[in-house]
């Protein structure tokens, strides 16, 4: 039975270009999941957009001496150019700078305000007398009170993932001038998170299908007790408050950005000329998945669900399959720390499927994972080229050369051949299960294992020898290997859409796998074929040194 799946993906801050951490953490797993469900025949809506607001952008603008709008627009355009190169198949990608988003965020604010879930309070906020302004979020740095990490910021600690208030930091200082701020009174609006504590605990306790790290982090956080959080800031960049008298304040970026999932869905519906079409993705038995890196967990398992509970009538997350960090030398890739490997740069030298393969096979699903150029080259050469690509190339070239560019007659199948076909069908069942449960590494491992199995079959049968004595036997071996390839193109499709599309045409099927289904399709005897080009290119070992030198390690 087909399902309806909503996929929300973290909104990247438009303060820098994309690095491999973003891809491995959020965008690639979301895209794999979307492509998989579309191929299964499910209805999918995958949305996100650039986060144009917040202090990461104003800080960058101040550093460069340009406006925040200019910074945000520049990186938004770069993201838009990167997505197709990466093969990220958005149903809709927008930004938080739209009038639709501001309106949706303001409506959410007012709805929660009217129900008493948002209230006003006077608080002490850090104020730098040297810079003469309040210091929101990332304008303050200091030591995390929980894990003692020294580079924690006024909104969150990147090391232990806990959201923070500036006043909780130890040894806090102004990011701009390094002086310790004083605390001054200012009025802010608060989200009454405490009102949702019990409902949230009851809800999270039913989420036994969540990843252990996500579930444990969330429960620990909830059981420490929820504090109400300020959701406005003294800033002039962001979505204005929908109430008169607060012109110098804006909605806090984290309250506002998560609303993007809803506003993007509405904008998608409007763009299709069906303004109500978003509703079916936010109600009924639609399952909502949110793909994010682990620093975003509390915003998606606590704050956003609390907002949705308060508003009512909209689906809560079904799953939040958050990834851990992609690291270099055990440090989180970070724009701000400048230790990143940039997506556009990598894609200017290597194929997109090589990158997607490495990041899928080494995805930081359950622990932080170091990116390694040695692994990049090894997996490309040993697995993509020697195991999978070579299998396709050997089989299809022989078929084209010896059987007049047509899928050959295979006659009667022997035991060994039937076993490979059965294993291929079983692999599709197992990858289906793994992908359904967001076990991406497991799924891609299963597919590559079948490619190895098909190579063993081919080496045993040796059609290049058979053909000299028994052309019909060689035809059978090659046909059965084509059946395995037919299964592989489906299983690899969510991960490696470019090469799967090509393999699909080489096998005589169309290139649009999403129009098929997650089953083993047999190549059609007599179908005309075009001789194949290699699916992947071998990389020189020198790539490891060149790239490591480029990173300055
Ligand atoms: N090294 C990483 N590994 C895994 N996920 C990451 C990594 N860096 C960022 N992400 C995820 O990518 C998404 C978008 O990131 P965002 O633009 O918010 O950057 P960020 O986390 O502030 O990164 P930075 O530290 O580079 O400024 C978020 O869900 C974030 O968790
Ligand atoms: Zn200062």
From Swiss-Prot:
The keyword Calcium does not apply. Its cofactor is Zn(2+). It catalyses: tRNA(Met) + L-methionine + ATP = L-methionyl-tRNA(Met) + AMP + diphosphate. Binds 1 zinc ion per subunit. It is found in: Cytoplasm. It comes from the Bacteria. It holds the Pfam family tRNA-synt_1g. One of its GO terms (biological process) is methionyl-tRNA aminoacylation. Is required not only for elongation of protein synthesis but also for the initiation of all mRNA translation through initiator tRNA(fMet) aminoacylation. Monomer. Belongs to the class-I aminoacyl-tRNA synthetase family. MetG type 1 subfamily. This is Methionine--tRNA ligase. It comes from Dehalococcoides mccartyi (strain CBDB1). The lineage of its organism: Bacteria, Bacillati, Chloroflexota, Dehalococcoidia, Dehalococcoidales.
């Amino acid at each position: 039975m087909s399902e309806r799946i909503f996929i929300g993906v973290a909104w990247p801050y438009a303060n820098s270009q994309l690095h491999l951490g973003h891809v491995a953490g959020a965008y690639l797993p979301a895209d794999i999941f979307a492509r998989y469900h579309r191929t299964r025949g499910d209805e999918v809506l995958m949305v996100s957009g650039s986060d144009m607001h917040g202090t990461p952008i104003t800080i960058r603008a101040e550093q460069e001496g340009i406006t925040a709008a200019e910074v945000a627009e520049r990186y938004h355009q770069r993201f838009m150019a990167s997505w197709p190169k990466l093969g990220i198949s958005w149903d809709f990608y927008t930004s938080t700078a739209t009038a639709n988003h501001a309106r949706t965020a303001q409506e959410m604010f007012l709805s929660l305000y009217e129900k008493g879930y948002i209230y006003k309070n006077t608080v002490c906020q850090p104020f730098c007398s040297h810079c003469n302004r309040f210091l929101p979020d990332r304008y303050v740095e200091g030591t995390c009170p929980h894990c003692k990490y020294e580079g924690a910021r006024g909104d969150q600690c990147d090391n232990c993932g806990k959201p923070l208030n500036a006043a909780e930091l130890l040894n806090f200082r102004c990011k701009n001038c390094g002086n310790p701020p004083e605390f001054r009174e200012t009025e802010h609006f608060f989200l009454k998170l405490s009102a949702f504590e019990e409902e949230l605990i009851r809800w999270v306790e039913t989420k036994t299908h969540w990843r252990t790290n996500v579930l444990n982090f969330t429960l620990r956080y909830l059981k420490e007790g929820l504090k109400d959080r300020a959701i406005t800031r003294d800033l002039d960049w962001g979505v204005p408050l929908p109430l008169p008298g607060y012109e110098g304040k804006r909605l806090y970026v984290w309250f506002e950005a998560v609303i993007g999932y809803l506003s993007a869905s509405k904008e998608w519906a409007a763009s299709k000329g069906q303004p109500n079409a978003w509703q079916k993705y936010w109600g009924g038995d639609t399952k909502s998945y949110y793909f994010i890196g682990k620093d975003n967990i509390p915003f998606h398992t606590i704050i956003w669900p609390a907002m949705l509970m308060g508003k009512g009538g909209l689906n809560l997350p079904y799953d939040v399959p958050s990834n851990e960090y992609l690291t270099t030398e055990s440090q989180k890739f970070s724009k701000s720390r400048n230790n990143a490997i940039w997506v556009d740069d990598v894609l200017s030298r290597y194929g997109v499927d090589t990158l997607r393969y490495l990041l899928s096979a080494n995805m930081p699903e359950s622990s932080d994972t170091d990116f390694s150029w040695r692994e990049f080259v090894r997996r490309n050469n040993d697995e993509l080229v020697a195991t999978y690509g070579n299998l396709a190339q050997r089989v299809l070239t022989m078929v084209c050369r010896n059987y007049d560019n047509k899928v050959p007659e295979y006659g009667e199948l022997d035991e060994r051949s039937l076993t490979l076909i059965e294993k291929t069908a079983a692999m599709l069942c197992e990858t289906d299960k793994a992908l359904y449960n967001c076990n991406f590494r497991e799924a891609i491992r299963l597919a590559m294992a079948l490619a190895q199995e098909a190579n063993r079959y081919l080496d045993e049968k040796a059609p290049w020898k058979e053909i000299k004595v028994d052309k019909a036997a060689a035809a059978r071996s090659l046909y059965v290997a084509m059946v395995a390839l037919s299964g592989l193109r489906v299983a690899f499709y969510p991960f490696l859409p470019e090469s799967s599309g090509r393999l699909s045409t080489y096998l005589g099927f169309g290139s649009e796998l999403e129009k098929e289904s997650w089953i083993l399709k047999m190549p059609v005897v007599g179908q005309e074929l075009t001789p194949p080009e290699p699916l992947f290119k071998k990389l020189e070992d020198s790539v490891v040194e060149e790239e490591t030198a480029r990173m300055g390690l």
